[in-house]
UniProtKB/Swiss-Prot annotation:
Membrane topology: Single-pass type II membrane protein
Transmembrane segments annotated in the record for this chain: 18-38
Family: Belongs to the short-chain dehydrogenases/reductases (SDR) family.
Name of protein: Dehydrogenase/reductase SDR family member 7B
CC annotations in GO: endoplasmic reticulum membrane; membrane; nucleus; peroxisome; transcription regulator complex
EC category: oxidoreductase
The gene coding this protein: Dhrs7b
Keyword tags: Endoplasmic reticulum, Membrane, NAD, NADP, Oxidoreductase, Signal-anchor, Transmembrane, Transmembrane helix
Gene Ontology molecular function, alphabetical: DNA-binding transcription factor binding; oxidoreductase activity; transcription corepressor activity
Amino acid sequence: MISPSSRKGMLKERAMDLVTQTTILPLLFGCLGIFSLFRLLQRTRSKAYLRNAVVVVTGATSGLGKECARVFHAAGAKVVLCGRNVKALEEFTRELADSSSSQGQTHQPCVVTFDLADPGAIAPAAAEILQCFGYVDILINNAGISYRGAISDTIVDVDRKVMEINYFGPVALTKALLPSMVERKRGHIVAISSIQGKISIPFRSAYAASKHATQAFFDCLRAEMKDSDIEVTVISPGYIHTNLSVNAVTADGSRYGALDKNTAQGRSAVEVAQDIFDAVGKKKKDVLLTDFLPTMAVYIRTLAPRLFFRIMASRARKERKSKNS
């Protein structure tokens, strides 16, 4: 015989089951449905925003720039490939053309060859870029150079070279193309910065300085262009498995010529390019593409600066000891 207390407990349990079935579960599935619909609408808007858009990619001959150009081209954008090596750009153009048949409607890329390190080349290059399709929707400032060396050993010409390529070149190109965007009240400027635009690590001074400057400039530009309907996105990746360290400049201006450990263990350029594509499509403002520990370092730098400085000093000692051993 069931006692009154047991019967009461059973009734309570059944009531809870009924509430769960009639209220909580439908609510849960409803929320999931709304979220899925939101994601679908977001993807649809992103595709519409990027399809047929004129996208300029600097540093498109290799690494991240090449993969960015590839993913935007596959999405139906009209891509302008920029770089110093005309042969490499033409080969990449043929590669994209060969892959077009399996990717639906795509456009023949346009090639513009120039050197960001040459201040006199920027204005003519911008004019040539505008001649490709008549206007620019999205400018991806990707081209850059890295650096390895101690501050005390580095000649100032090296600092100037890194700043010219990583900061002054992109700034000059942005300023050259900006008036046409403002006139159309449409445009999107993307700066490929680095986590080292948010924190500085030892033996990367010139590179970190150029990326800090990049972050600051494009943050200012975003605010100033708000009323002109110009979007500005700053992307700050961590280590990417490319030849960036191999082609880095050293203290005396020579080529570093080695794939260092952190770069070798970095994310693939294909993955990062897809993340950049998604961020641009969603018109994100500031994107940090790093693993957990580097992301935490950014917060530690802000919330516990003394701890951050001790960590960096320890890293400097270890790296110096490793070089001297």
